[in-house]
């Protein structure tokens, strides 16, 4: 296995082993040359192995000096065209059935990846990022799948810190667009599929998948992980997941697989009971986060978890549990011999981790902080860290299906200087409806509200929908870099 791993890394090969009870065939495919270098087994096994490579090959392939033609189109030239085309298709039903059938046609190649699966209401992206940074420090190549996009559509799929290549998306779309239409799979399912292919092509050591919505019916639930992780349970996406903590916990418990252990940072007993029941049915172990000790608030929060003294490069208190959950997961993987893990990698990786849009200081003068607190629990956690800020002024916007009354009331506990805005999104709430009867300012154009920052003194906190934060971040960075 170690030889295979190094071979993959150094030469960018895909090695596929046909395995029943015993290994009875192997194929080696060079993804740079598009050449099958080796194929061993009986004639029947060889045909099966070649069929797998033909299915995932993006271009004509060479085998024994002969060309095997791969059918592909020239429909797309730029990755933006791919997304525009997919968005034009009809709405898809929130179900995993079609995607399961689709992946069966691809021999369930996702099972070749060593995955970690992360669900939860808040903190998923941060937890993924903390794990990725520590694994990177340990020398591993790590693929991550997170959503929604914050900086670019490309940042959903990354290897270490590099976004997926635009041309890869174009090549995959031209190769498989007819299959997408045939199975009527959704944009999110297509993104998951592209990530699976990309991680296989690039030979990642590990892939970490963040659930998009819920758990059981989410497209990421197509993977077979080494371990499943839950950050917490909050009241969000209630139209899809139900309007109680219990119903949301049941939806998220849907990622629990047979004999795959489940680690959670959730504290509410009614949710933990649901996780425990599901784990028992799945013959999986439920693992809960240990107590966190010696917490120190400040510019860099500090704490002790088990025997590790951790310092985070953020004042955001909510990142303590996210990073501790990441650490607990990595310690589990080490204990069960999935990974090697040194203390230096843990300490350095957790400290160096940064995640855009989560208590992100984007400017020092004036002090501007971005935070994607987009639901009740998110705003509660934001309050804990933001209450120490002085002369605070808030700019806020949200989607219309969120509990915006609660969110604004909580923000008013921090300051009465709040401006509500709008942003471009089909579900964006109008500034007027956001404001209601609350003592807040209304400025529909968020750009005008941001421009006004530079005419005032104080500390500025911009918060709400992650889609809003994405737009704000782009605008502010352009403004900062133009000075």
Mark where each language-model region is.
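Short functional linear segments
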Residues: 73-120, 127-140, 145
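C-terminal helical cap/extension that packs against the catalytic core
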Residues: 268-278, 283-287, 297-300, 367-368, ...
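Active-site rim helix/loop that mediates acceptor-substrate recognition in acyltransferases
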Residues: 2-14, 18-19
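Extended acidic/charged loop-beta regions that coordinate divalent cations
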Residues: 191-240, 272-309
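Nucleotide phosphate-binding/pyrophosphate-handling subdomain across enzymes
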Residues: 112, 201, 206-209, 219-229, ...
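Acyl-donor binding region in acyl/amide transferases
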Residues: 33-72
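Conserved beta-strand in the GNAT
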Residues: 22-31, 35-37
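ATP-dependent carboxylate-amine ligase catalytic core
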Residues: 93-96, 100-111, 137-223, 239-241, ...
């Amino acid at each position: 296995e170690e030889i295979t791993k190094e071979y993959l890394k150094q030469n960018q090969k895909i090695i596929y082993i046909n395995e029943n009870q015993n290994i009875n065939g192997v194929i080696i495919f060079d993804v740079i040359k598009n050449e099958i270098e080796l194929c061993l087994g009986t004639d029947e096994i060889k045909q099966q192995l070649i069929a797998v490579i033909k299915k995932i090959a993006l271009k004509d392939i060479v085998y024994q000096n002969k060309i095997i033609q791969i059918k592909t189109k020239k429909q797309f030239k730029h990755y933006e065209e791919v997304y525009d085309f997919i968005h034009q298709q009809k709405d898809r039903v929130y179900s995993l059935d079609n995607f399961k059938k689709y992946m069966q046609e691809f021999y369930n190649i996702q099972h070749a990846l060593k995955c970690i699966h992360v669900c939860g209401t808040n903190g998923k992206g941060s937890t993924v990022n903390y794990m990725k940074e520590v694994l990177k420090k340990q020398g591993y190549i790590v693929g991550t799948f997170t959503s929604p996009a914050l900086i670019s559509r490309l940042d959903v799929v990354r290897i270490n810190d590099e976004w997926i290549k635009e041309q890869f998306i174009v090549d995959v779309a031209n190769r498989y667009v007819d299959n997408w239409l045939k199975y009527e799979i959704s944009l999110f399912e297509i993104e998951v599929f592209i990530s699976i292919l990309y991680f296989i092509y690039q030979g990642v050591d590990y892939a970490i998948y963040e659930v998009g919505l819920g758990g059981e019916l989410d497209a990421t639930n197509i993977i077979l992980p080494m371990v499943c992780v839950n950050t917490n349970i909050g009241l969000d996406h209630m139209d899809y997941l139900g309007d109680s903590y219990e119903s949301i916990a049941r939806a998220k418990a849907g990622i629990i697989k047979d004999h795959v252990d489940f680690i959670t940072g959730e504290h509410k007993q009614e949710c933990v009971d649901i996780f425990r029941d599901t784990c028992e049915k799945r013959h999986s172990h439920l693992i809960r986060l240990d107590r966190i000790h010696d917490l120190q608030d400040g510019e860099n929060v500090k704490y002790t978890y088990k025997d590790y003294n951790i310092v985070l490069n953020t004042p955001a208190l909510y990142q303590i549990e996210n990073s501790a959950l990441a650490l607990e997961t990595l310690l589990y993987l080490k204990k069960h011999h999935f990974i090697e893990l040194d203390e230096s990698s843990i300490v350095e990786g957790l400290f160096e981790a940064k995640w855009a849009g989560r208590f992100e200081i984007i400017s020092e003068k004036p002090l501007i902080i971005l935070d994607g607190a987009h639901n009740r629990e998110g705003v509660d956690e934001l309050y804990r860290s933001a209450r120490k800020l002085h002369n605070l002024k808030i700019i806020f916007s949200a989607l219309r299906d969120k509990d915006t009354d609660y969110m604004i009331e909580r923000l008013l506990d921090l300051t009465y200087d709040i401006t509500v805005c709008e942003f471009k999104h089909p579900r964006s709430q109008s500034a007027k409806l956001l404001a209601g009867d609350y003592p807040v300012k209304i400025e529909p154009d968020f750009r005008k509200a941001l421009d006004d920052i530079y005419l005032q003194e104080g500390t500025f906190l911009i918060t709400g929908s992650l889609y809003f934060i994405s737009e704000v971040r782009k605008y502010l960075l352009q403004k900062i870099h133009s000075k």
